[in-house]
A protein has these predicted regions:
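Intrinsically disordered, low-complexity, repeat-rich regions
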Residues: 1-116, 122-128, 132-192
Length: 192
C-alpha cells in the first residue's frame, strides 16, 4: 500500500505541485520585503564615467549621455519619443554602466532575481521607472508588481512622486501619443 502511495507521489504532476508548495513556503520564510536602499539616488548622472558600447546608439538632447545605447527598435523609437515630448525634462537609459538600478523580485519558479528596468524618466511632477515591452513573458507580472511596490516605497522615503510605467509595443506602435502623460492615462485605464 505504501509503495502505491509513493508511486502516486512520484507522478510528474504531483511532484510539480509538491515542489511548488515547498518553494512557496520556503520563500515565505526567507524572502523578506525590504525598503529600497537609496544609495542609487545619491549617484548623479553627471558622475557616470564614459564607457564603450558595442550596441547601437543614438544622439539625443534630454540626456546626460552623448550617445544613448538601445537594444531594439522599440527602445530606439521610445527614446526618440522621450526626447521630443514636452512633458519629459530628462531621461537616462538604465543599465549597469549608468544608473545600475536593479529591483529584486521572485520569478515564476521561486528564485530571487534582479530586474533592470529600461529607463528612468523625469517629468515636472514625478519620476518614472519605465519598461518597454515587446513580448510579455512569464515573469512580467512579478516584475511589474515589485517595481510598483519599489516606486511606492521610494516615494514615501524621498517625498518625491515615483511611478512605474510599462509601455507595451502594441500600444506604442498604435501611435497617437503626444506626451508621457498619455501613456500614464492608458496604464491607469488598463489597471481597471
Amino acid at each position: 500500500d505504501n509503495i502505491e502511495a509513493l508511486k502516486k507521489l512520484n507522478l510528474p504532476v504531483v511532484r510539480k505541485v509538491i515542489i511548488s508548495n515547498f518553494i512557496e513556503e520556503i520563500n515565505k520564510l526567507v524572502v523578506v520585503e525590504e525598503t529600497p536602499i537609496l544609495s542609487i539616488f545619491l549617484k548623479k548622472a553627471s558622475d557616470i564615467k564614459p564607457f564603450q558600447c558595442s550596441v547601437n546608439t543614438i544622439n539625443l538632447r534630454k540626456t546626460i549621455l552623448n550617445k544613448v545605447p538601445y537594444s531594439n527598435e522599440l527602445e530606439k523609437n521610445f527614446l526618440i519619443f522621450l526626447d521630443h515630448v514636452n512633458d519629459v525634462e530628462a531621461f537616462i537609459k538604465n543599465e549597469t554602466r549608468t544608473m545600475n538600478l536593479k529591483i529584486p523580485y521572485v520569478d515564476h519558479a521561486g528564485f530571487l532575481r534582479n530586474y533592470i528596468p529600461d529607463f528612468v524618466v523625469k517629468t515636472p511632477d514625478l519620476m518614472l521607472i519605465v519598461e518597454t515591452k515587446g513580448r510579455i513573458d512569464i515573469d512580467v507580472a512579478a516584475k511589474d508588481a515589485q517595481t510598483r511596490r519599489w516606486a511606492q516605497m521610494v516615494s514615501a522615503k524621498t517625498n518625491k512622486n515615483w511611478e512605474f510605467l510599462r509601455v507595451n509595443q502594441s500600444d506604442f506602435d498604435g501611435g497617437g501619443y503626444n506626451s508621457i502623460r498619455d501613456f500614464l492615462i492608458l496604464a491607469s485605464k488598463q489597471k481597471h
